[in-house]
Curated annotation (Swiss-Prot):
Disruption phenotype: Disruption of the gene does not change the piliation compared with the parent cells. One of its GO terms (cellular component) is cell surface. Residues 1-12 form a propeptide. Contains an amino terminal motif QXSXEXXXL, which is part of a class III signal sequence. A motif (QXSXEXXXL) lies at residues 13-21. InterPro entries: Class3_signal_pept_motif. Pfam families: Class_IIIsignal. It is found in: Secreted; Cell surface; Fimbrium. Induction: Expressed under standard laboratory conditions at 35 degrees Celsius. The N-terminus is probably cleaved by the prepilin peptidase EppA, which recognizes the class III signal sequence. It comes from Methanococcus maripaludis (strain DSM 14266 / JCM 13030 / NBRC 101832 / S2 / LL). This is Probable minor pilin MMP0903. It comes from the Archaea. The keyword Magnesium does not apply.
């Protein structure tokens, strides 16, 4: 009985360790996915802010040029 019980116990421990290892790998994958999604969302917000700033600067430049042309034609 001793030898069979020992062999079964080792298989059970290996199975438990494998289960813990798989769980750890899954948790790391979930955490990496979370960080990837957070990074993507932050990048999207930053891109939106940059685009809005660029459009605002472009509009200001166009308005200044339009006023300059309007002033030239009024003179």
């Amino acid at each position: 009985m001793g030898l069979k019980y020992l062999a079964f116990k080792n298989r059970g421990q290996i199975s438990l360790e494998l289960g813990v290892l798989v769980l750890a790998v899954a948790m790391v994958a979930v955490f990496a996915g979370y960080l990837y999604i957070q990074s993507t969302l932050e990048s999207a917000v930053k891109i939106n802010q940059t685009a809005n700033g660029t459009v605002g600067m472009y509009n200001s430049a166009v308005n200044r040029i339009t006023e300059s042309v309007g002033n030239l034609s009024n003179n």
